[in-house]
Amino acid sequence: MPKVLAIVLAGGKGERLFPLTSFRSKPSVPFGARYRIVDFVLSNLVNSQIYSIYLLVQYKSQSLIEHIRQNWFFSSVGSDHFVTVVPPQMRMGPEWFQGTADAVFQNIGLIKEHNPDIVLIFGADHIYRMDIRQMIKFHIENNAHVTVAARPVALKHASSFGVIITDPDHRIAGFQEKPKDPIPMPDNPDMAYVSMGNYIFNADILIDALVRAEKKKQHDFGAHVIPDLVGRKCKVYAYDFAKNEIPGIKSYEERGYWRDVGTISAYFDAHMDMLGEKPIFEIYNKMWPIHPARYEGPPVKILDGEIKNSIIAEGALIYGGKIENSFIRSGSIIEKDVEIKDSLIMDDVIIKRNSKLYRVIVDKKNVVYEGEKIGFSAEQDRFRCYIDSSGICILPRAARYNDWIKEINHA
């Protein structure tokens, strides 16, 4: 295997995920009962035996930096085994990162110092499993300069992505970045072939492309670098993500599952995809684990109640009530006679007795008051919650911090 360096772009604002991104970047938003969004790309890299990883951060990065420090460190097994967070250094000038390509250009010295054969440029804000070694194999076998991970999406959604036009041998002949009128796939007029935002570059090609882009003040891979490489007849190929084989995948799972959780509704739906006896994305896969945050507290304790089709993390304390189609993260306390349905309860939340929640996201360090009902009346909810366009109610992080502190001290 060639010498590989991975650069993970983890600086996204995640504005469409507001208010979950009020105090954190999109990659550090909690996901599932034990994870953060960034854990999926990092798990894919480590499971693929890729251990040299730089994580480029920018906006509201402290939460992400702490998560990496506490959960993603390697023992002293060699200088090429690291997950290193890289904030903007501003060595090239006073500006922060101006785009995805500019973020890598500003750290071009790290690439030269590491001296890899190939460089992976991956995003940090998608939910999926991928054996990246198979994409590397495809890249090498095709003698490619650049390989772009790609997948089909419905034509009506393709305007949100970079749309790819390929030759029969998978070489990219055209690239449209977020076009108003995307070109459909030749064999399926209802679908378009789109970039997943994950790239493999030969190191020399990447360095040259970044320097060219900087001279033109072009700062984005999808909008500038990839189209320029295609236009200059470089060997740019598309890797079909649907052909990626993951060990341990069940027959009932969706083939090539990949979700952009950039909106509240998409984020919520991706959670629901993990529930049920036969979920389309099975989080329980010992052969390709998603590595969670370490938790040093006690196990979950359930004293009473009725729990259906839900995932409960360590450290949760459940006194009773009904929980259905929901996620409860670490340290949360659910009192008696509570009803929670189709909801996401994040870390260290207190749900007081006789309260009812339906399609609600309660961010961390919050309290839901005794007898309170959220998710049943938009007219009432708008005074106490953020209501997404999808109708999902969100109680922002620490929105009731003073009351939460009183409950903690009282307990």
UniProtKB/Swiss-Prot annotation:
InterPro entries: ADP-Glc_PPase, ADP_Glu_pyroP_CS, GlgC_bac, GlmU/GlgC-like_hexapep, NTP_transferase_dom, Nucleotide-diphossugar_trans, Trimer_LpxA-like_sf. Alpha-D-glucose 1-phosphate binds at G162, E177, K178, S195. Signal peptide: none annotated. Pathway: Glycan biosynthesis; glycogen biosynthesis. SUPFAM superfamilies: Nucleotide-diphospho-sugar transferases (SSF53448), Trimeric LpxA-like enzymes (SSF51161). Its EC number is 2.7.7.27. The keyword Amino-acid biosynthesis does not apply. GO terms for molecular function: ATP binding; glucose-1-phosphate adenylyltransferase activity. PROSITE patterns: ADP_GLC_PYROPHOSPH_2, ADP_GLC_PYROPHOSPH_3. Keywords: ATP-binding, Carbohydrate metabolism, Glycogen biosynthesis, Glycogen metabolism, Nucleotide-binding, Nucleotidyltransferase, Transferase. CDD domains: ADP_Glucose_PP (cd02508), LbH_G1P_AT_C (cd04651). It catalyses: alpha-D-glucose 1-phosphate + ATP + H(+) = ADP-alpha-D-glucose + diphosphate. Homotetramer. NCBIfam families: glgC, PRK00844.1. This is Glucose-1-phosphate adenylyltransferase. It comes from Thermodesulfovibrio yellowstonii (strain ATCC 51303 / DSM 11347 / YP87). The lineage of its organism: Bacteria, Pseudomonadati, Nitrospirota, Thermodesulfovibrionia, Thermodesulfovibrionales. The gene is glgC.
